[in-house]
Amino acid sequence: MSTGLPEAWPRLLGDVGGSNARFALETAPGVIEDILTLSNERYPTLEDALRDYLAQVGARRVAHAAIGIANPLNGDLVRMTNCHWSFSIEATRRALGLSTLLLLNDFTALALALPRLPRRELAQVGGGAPRPDAPLALIGPGTGLGVSALVPHAGGWRALAGEGGHTSFAPANEREIGIWRYASARFGHVSHERLLSGSGLSLLHRALCALDGAEEAGLAPAEVSARGLSGADARCREALEIFCALLGSAAGNLALTLGARGGVYIGGGIVPRLSGFFEQSPFRRRFEDKGRMSAYLADIPVYLITSAYPALPGVAAHLADHLAPRSDPAPVAAPTHPRGGTAGDMHA
């Protein structure tokens, strides 16, 4: 919410995930500086994290702030599902002396940023050229599984907010049926997020151990990735392959649901760390493996987002739209990413 429109700059921006919070100052339109990443577990509340950030960067008076957050938003009270923070938006605004404090879903923020991402921060994984006036889909595994989209609206774009990561996982082969049974016995409902997340990667590895009659080594996600990428552990490598395959199926479903011929974007913190493995993985095959609709999906480009802080421009755009003296958001030009580039261009 906001009260009035005092000092316009700098503006405080945030992107809060389940594990880390990234904060920055926008000192002029599109100029984002002083980016810091803070560990959520170090701070009792969001307010404490914000105060520490402002102290570290020596920020002068800040009046307006917006934060993308990895959580559903419904009213003033926020209880984070993947973090211990629980807070009132209005109470936090007052405590920090802000005139404006907006919260939006983190993947809505990332969706708003998609048309603003430079080509050098995207790596194309298959498909053709994007259609300029078609929807854009966004999916990304991290601490959880974020899903969003941009749809054409009034000469610009409108972001869709939802909880698509919690849709039901459907296995596609016997091995995946075994994984579903393993997860279902422990959790009941098996969502895509249950498997397509950091903890999901560990769960996949444990399930494979159980299916093979091996001891369930409780490996952390980073250990599964490292052993799989190095080839030191065949079961870890299979877990990575299945992870990419399941992500391909989920991304293909999303593309069909939205008609996302403008492209499907992969965000989140996990896939960029898979280096060239992702390009050679079953992802693209499973993305297109939709029977009669396979040819439709074969033309849709997939872009891996390689930017270190991709959501912050979207947070800035949301805040700018809120503060601008007009009723409708300013149109955003359609992205025109040319065909080319590979997942080998990515960086961690």
Swiss-Prot record:
Residues given in the record as ATP binding sites: 14-19
| Official protein name in the record | Glucokinase
Q: Where in the cell is it found?
A: Cytoplasm
Alphabetically, the GO molecular function entries are:
ATP binding; D-glucose binding; glucokinase activity
InterPro entries on file: ATPase_NBD, Bacterial_glucokinase, Glucokinase
Question: By its UniProt entry, which PANTHER family does this protein fall under?
Answer: GLUCOKINASE
Q: Quote the gene name from the UniProt entry.
A: glk
Where do the segments described as Disordered lie?
A: 327-348
An example GO BP is:
glycolytic process
Q: Which Pfam families match?
A: Glucokinase
What does the entry list under GO cellular component?
Answer: cytosol
Keyword field: ATP-binding, Cytoplasm, Glycolysis, Kinase, Nucleotide-binding, Transferase
